[in-house]
Amino acid sequence: MSAPRTLYDKIFDDHLVDRQDDGTCLLYIDRHLVHEVTSPQAFEGLRMAGRKVHAPTRTLAVVDHNVPTTPDRAEGIKNEESRIQVEALAKNAADFGVEYYSEKDKRQGIVHIVGPEQGFTLPGMTIVCGDSHTSTHGAFGALAHGIGTSEVEHVLATQTLIQKKAKNMLVRVDGKLPAGVTAKDIILAIIGEIGTAGGTGHVIEFAGEAIEALSMEGRMTVCNMTIEGGARAGLIAPDEKTFEYIKGKPRAPKGEELEMALQYWKTLHTDEGAHFDRTVVLDAANLPPIVSWGSSPEDVISVQGVVPNPDDIADENKRTSKWRALDYMGLKPGTKITDITIDRVFIGSCTNGRIEDLRAAAAVLKDRKVASTVSAMVVPGSGLVKEQAEAEGLDKIFLDAGCEWREPGCSMCLAMNDDRLKPEERCASTSNRNFEGRQGYKGRTHLVSPAMAAAAAIAGHFVDIREWK
């Protein structure tokens, strides 16, 4: 009888092509997602070597990082570098026979939102993309992680990847979430607990009652930010919610193929007694709505808290780092989080750009107005999310409140397109990173949930969504 295995062990073993004596492994890759920023050199490498894409039907190309989100984007991309990258992806996809969703295709959107909604992402698969937030797809019980540009070329050419097996880490969130606390708060709390290096060298499996209670959208939010916790990939075991989400998706198996797939998918869970190298347990009942205060995703605190004093930190290097973060953010120790005023609000990204996220923001904004001192932008994560939101009338709620309603794309999550902060502008953002300059030169980012961002847009400062009337 074989030893009990974790979910990660099972998927890894099922895709193992070869293992060397030093632990170096060759894994088969089921799905490869491609976007315009990390793929040009990879395709050029294939072209120069006279190689083909090994499995074009297992590859999907989507433009997302550089595309404008303004209504006039059909007129073209003004920034030359961005335009060249987008044009290169279109040409490369055509030359190598890879399916491509351009900015004119309603299926276009952020690659990590497009994959699941197309049924391209399925349980038990290995999935890679030249993007660190590929961990999002782990919400389906898939082993998914980002890869570098040279690895993109390797996967295109061979449909395999060289890597060493990671350690197993379990993060269990027990109990029920209080009202007003969301998947975004769960993952921010986890990162606050373990730090941005806490998962280094591990694949994290998220489990527990609070995780199981999340919708698929919520699970994607949690897995999306696994990389901010230091782990390359995050996993959640698939269940009936997963299967129902997948059924009927364009690329999902159907009929007898679906029945066969379900038999396999139902084996994708950690065996009782399987070994984890590290376990972290959180109590969902104690989790508050969370706001980041510094320039790292681990710099988080309850909305009812105050900006911490770095002098309370014993480690000199960490203390210096946190003082630098406060200086960059223009904040002082002891400041109440609810006293921090904001200039901008960004609702979107591969973390929180799905229909559930937009519904949560719209529920707060309905029949209210964005503060006169705040500029708010809502960017759906895909053309299909946009279509669904408009069918539900969410766009009208956003526009009536004074928000901008945009076209799909990565937008203000990162300063690679026209959506960016000006120096020292402060933004309540539903994205995943608050690094220096992430949303624009000297821009100040606070990471929050969609409902918290919407409430801040109305109040002009952070508020506790649990007390929102």
UniProtKB/Swiss-Prot annotation:
It catalyses: (2R,3S)-3-isopropylmalate = (2S)-2-isopropylmalate. PROSITE patterns: ACONITASE_1, ACONITASE_2. The keyword Cell cycle does not apply. GO terms for biological process: L-leucine biosynthetic process. It holds the Pfam family Aconitase. Its EC number is 4.2.1.33. [4Fe-4S] cluster binds at C350, C410, C413. Pathway: Amino-acid biosynthesis; L-leucine biosynthesis; L-leucine from 3-methyl-2-oxobutanoate: step 2/4. GO terms for molecular function: 3-isopropylmalate dehydratase activity; 4 iron, 4 sulfur cluster binding; metal ion binding. Binds 1 [4Fe-4S] cluster per subunit. It comes from the Bacteria. Its cofactor is [4Fe-4S] cluster. Keywords: 4Fe-4S, Amino-acid biosynthesis, Branched-chain amino acid biosynthesis, Iron, Iron-sulfur, Leucine biosynthesis, Lyase, Metal-binding. It is an enzyme of class 4 (lyase). Catalyzes the isomerization between 2-isopropylmalate and 3-isopropylmalate, via the formation of 2-isopropylmaleate. Heterodimer of LeuC and LeuD. Belongs to the aconitase/IPM isomerase family. LeuC type 1 subfamily. This is 3-isopropylmalate dehydratase large subunit. It comes from Allorhizobium ampelinum (strain ATCC BAA-846 / DSM 112012 / S4). The gene is leuC.
